[in-house]
Amino acid sequence: MPLADYFVTVQKTNTRGRMANNRQESIEKIKELTEGIDFCMLTTIDGGHLRSRPMSTQQFEFDGDLWFFTSDNTHKIDEIAKDNRINVAYSKPDDNTYLSVSGRAEVVKDKAKIEELWSPVLKAWFPEGLDDPHLCLLKIPVEQAEYWDAPSSKIVQLFGMVKAIATGQEADYGENKKIQL
């Protein structure tokens, strides 16, 4: 029954971990990494154990927060009430792109915000629409992120491995960067 709208703003670090202060560049990188990803996995903590579930995403303008529609009577809401630390993982295997973000979730029942983010496609999860008494949002201000973005062509990857073996140098497997807000 979970679901929907998200997006993030972050500061980007380079491969060696130094911080780049260009906020717009960071926004564009996250947009690029998440473009075309329909589902992510939202992970909560349940009695010391990790519990994940798929969530559907839609893109819209963002300011550093992930937003998801959900119902206030779900296990994840109970888990967040006890420990609001979460992780959201995105994956696009065809492009060898992976993104992991973490933050602290907040339950938001602000009707104006719900209406602002609402999309008719959400009726698939919430048949009562905006009149659903359990409808709420999860707001996740992103604190940290890490991504892996490798060349998408298997031939390019294979060439890089062969070149590394031939030259004795480490293969370039693409970018792996940590992002700290």
Regions found by a protein language model. Give the residues of each.
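Short active-site oxyanion
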Residues: 62-67
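Ligand/cofactor pocket segment of small-molecule handling proteins
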Residues: 70
